[in-house]
Amino acid sequence: DGLTWTFHLRDGLKWSDGSDLTADDFVYSWKRVCDPVVAAPYAETVLGMVKGFDEAQAGDLDALAVSAPDAKTFVVELSNPCPYFESLAAFATLSPVQQATVEANGDAWATAAETYISNGPFYITEWVPGSHITMSKNPNYWNADAIKLGSIKFVLMEDSNAAYTAYQ
Protein backbone atom coordinates (compact mmCIF):
# COMPACT_ATOMS: atom_id res chain seq x y z
CA ASP A 1 0.00 0.00 0.00
CA GLY A 2 3.06 2.28 0.08
CA LEU A 3 2.33 3.17 3.70
CA THR A 4 4.18 0.43 5.56
CA TRP A 5 7.90 -0.02 5.05
CA THR A 6 9.55 -3.08 6.56
CA PHE A 7 13.33 -3.32 6.83
CA HIS A 8 15.03 -6.63 7.63
CA LEU A 9 18.42 -6.37 9.29
CA ARG A 10 21.10 -8.83 8.25
CA ASP A 11 22.45 -11.38 10.72
CA GLY A 12 25.44 -10.56 12.89
CA LEU A 13 25.21 -6.76 13.01
CA LYS A 14 27.39 -5.33 15.78
CA TRP A 15 28.36 -1.97 17.17
CA SER A 16 32.06 -1.14 17.14
CA ASP A 17 32.21 -2.11 20.84
CA GLY A 18 31.02 -5.63 19.94
CA SER A 19 27.46 -5.35 21.27
CA ASP A 20 24.52 -6.35 19.07
CA LEU A 21 22.86 -3.79 16.82
CA THR A 22 19.12 -4.48 16.68
CA ALA A 23 15.94 -3.02 15.23
CA ASP A 24 15.33 -1.38 18.62
CA ASP A 25 18.40 0.77 17.95
CA PHE A 26 16.65 2.15 14.86
CA VAL A 27 13.44 2.79 16.82
CA TYR A 28 15.37 4.73 19.46
CA SER A 29 17.43 6.64 16.89
CA TRP A 30 14.51 7.68 14.69
CA LYS A 31 12.49 8.83 17.69
CA ARG A 32 15.54 10.75 18.91
CA VAL A 33 15.67 12.63 15.59
CA CYS A 34 12.15 13.90 16.35
CA ASP A 35 12.96 14.90 19.92
CA PRO A 36 12.53 18.68 20.28
CA VAL A 37 15.43 18.67 22.77
CA VAL A 38 17.75 17.23 20.09
CA ALA A 39 16.37 19.62 17.45
CA ALA A 40 17.78 17.66 14.51
CA PRO A 41 17.91 20.05 11.55
CA TYR A 42 16.64 17.56 8.94
CA ALA A 43 13.96 15.90 11.07
CA GLU A 44 11.00 17.12 9.04
CA THR A 45 12.74 16.44 5.73
CA VAL A 46 13.44 12.79 6.50
CA LEU A 47 10.57 11.92 8.85
CA GLY A 48 7.81 14.42 8.11
CA MET A 49 5.79 11.79 6.24
CA VAL A 50 5.95 9.23 9.06
CA LYS A 51 2.69 8.79 10.95
CA GLY A 52 2.81 10.61 14.28
CA PHE A 53 5.67 12.93 13.29
CA ASP A 54 3.96 16.15 14.42
CA GLU A 55 3.10 14.65 17.80
CA ALA A 56 6.66 13.36 18.21
CA GLN A 57 8.06 16.81 17.38
CA ALA A 58 5.79 18.21 20.09
CA GLY A 59 7.40 15.86 22.62
CA ASP A 60 5.33 12.64 22.42
CA LEU A 61 8.12 10.52 20.93
CA ASP A 62 6.11 7.32 21.25
CA ALA A 63 3.60 8.71 18.73
CA LEU A 64 6.11 8.21 15.90
CA ALA A 65 4.96 5.10 14.01
CA VAL A 66 8.20 3.13 14.09
CA SER A 67 8.45 -0.29 15.69
CA ALA A 68 10.61 -3.38 16.09
CA PRO A 69 8.44 -6.51 16.14
CA ASP A 70 11.64 -8.50 16.65
CA ALA A 71 15.39 -7.87 16.88
CA LYS A 72 15.90 -7.95 13.11
CA THR A 73 12.75 -6.24 11.80
CA PHE A 74 12.18 -2.48 11.71
CA VAL A 75 8.76 -1.20 10.58
CA VAL A 76 7.83 2.36 9.59
CA GLU A 77 4.27 3.54 8.91
CA LEU A 78 3.76 6.58 6.70
CA SER A 79 0.85 9.02 6.73
CA ASN A 80 0.72 8.91 2.94
CA PRO A 81 2.76 7.19 0.23
CA CYS A 82 6.24 8.55 -0.41
CA PRO A 83 7.85 6.87 -3.43
CA TYR A 84 11.34 8.11 -2.50
CA PHE A 85 11.15 7.06 1.17
CA GLU A 86 13.80 4.38 0.67
CA SER A 87 16.26 7.11 -0.31
CA LEU A 88 15.31 9.19 2.73
CA ALA A 89 15.81 6.17 4.99
CA ALA A 90 19.47 6.10 3.90
CA PHE A 91 20.01 9.73 4.98
CA ALA A 92 22.81 10.04 7.57
CA THR A 93 20.44 11.70 10.04
CA LEU A 94 18.63 8.36 10.35
CA SER A 95 21.74 6.28 11.02
CA PRO A 96 21.36 4.35 14.26
CA VAL A 97 23.05 5.60 17.41
CA GLN A 98 23.73 3.46 20.46
CA GLN A 99 21.19 4.39 23.14
CA ALA A 100 23.33 3.44 26.15
CA THR A 101 26.21 5.59 24.91
CA VAL A 102 24.03 8.59 24.11
CA GLU A 103 22.24 8.42 27.45
CA ALA A 104 25.47 7.97 29.43
CA ASN A 105 27.29 10.84 27.73
CA GLY A 106 24.58 13.33 26.77
CA ASP A 107 25.52 15.79 24.05
CA ALA A 108 29.18 14.79 24.40
CA TRP A 109 28.61 11.23 23.09
CA ALA A 110 29.81 12.20 19.60
CA THR A 111 32.79 14.34 20.56
CA ALA A 112 35.41 11.80 21.65
CA ALA A 113 36.81 8.56 20.28
CA GLU A 114 35.97 6.72 23.50
CA THR A 115 32.26 7.51 23.31
CA TYR A 116 31.65 7.53 19.56
CA ILE A 117 30.32 3.99 19.10
CA SER A 118 29.52 3.26 15.46
CA ASN A 119 28.55 0.34 13.23
CA GLY A 120 30.33 1.06 9.96
CA PRO A 121 33.49 -0.40 8.44
CA PHE A 122 35.70 1.93 10.52
CA TYR A 123 35.56 3.30 14.06
CA ILE A 124 37.26 6.32 15.60
CA THR A 125 40.43 5.40 17.49
CA GLU A 126 41.87 8.89 17.93
CA TRP A 127 40.34 12.36 17.80
CA VAL A 128 42.56 15.37 18.36
CA PRO A 129 40.32 18.44 17.98
CA GLY A 130 41.69 20.90 15.45
CA SER A 131 44.30 18.39 14.29
CA HIS A 132 43.08 14.99 13.06
CA ILE A 133 40.73 12.04 13.40
CA THR A 134 42.09 8.52 12.98
CA MET A 135 39.73 5.68 12.18
CA SER A 136 40.65 1.99 12.26
CA LYS A 137 39.09 -1.01 10.60
CA ASN A 138 36.12 -2.21 12.64
CA PRO A 139 36.59 -5.96 13.31
CA ASN A 140 32.90 -6.13 14.29
CA TYR A 141 31.68 -4.86 10.92
CA TRP A 142 29.45 -7.41 9.17
CA ASN A 143 31.70 -7.48 6.08
CA ALA A 144 35.08 -6.79 7.72
CA ASP A 145 36.95 -9.19 5.41
CA ALA A 146 36.12 -6.95 2.45
CA ILE A 147 37.71 -3.89 4.09
CA LYS A 148 41.29 -3.66 2.85
CA LEU A 149 42.49 -0.50 4.60
CA GLY A 150 43.66 -0.84 8.17
CA SER A 151 43.10 2.80 9.01
CA ILE A 152 42.20 6.24 7.67
CA LYS A 153 43.47 9.57 8.97
CA PHE A 154 41.49 12.77 8.40
CA VAL A 155 43.62 15.88 8.79
CA LEU A 156 41.53 18.78 10.04
CA MET A 157 42.31 22.24 8.70
CA GLU A 158 40.23 25.37 9.04
CA ASP A 159 42.35 27.43 6.65
CA SER A 160 41.35 26.55 3.08
CA ASN A 161 44.68 27.85 1.71
CA ALA A 162 46.62 25.58 4.06
CA ALA A 163 44.38 22.66 3.08
CA TYR A 164 44.98 23.33 -0.61
CA THR A 165 48.74 23.59 -0.06
CA ALA A 166 48.74 20.30 1.87
CA TYR A 167 46.74 18.69 -0.94
CA GLN A 168 49.29 19.75 -3.55
Listing of model-derived features with the role each one plays in the protein:
Residues 8, 21-27, 34, 38-100:
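Surface-exposed binding/hinge segments that line
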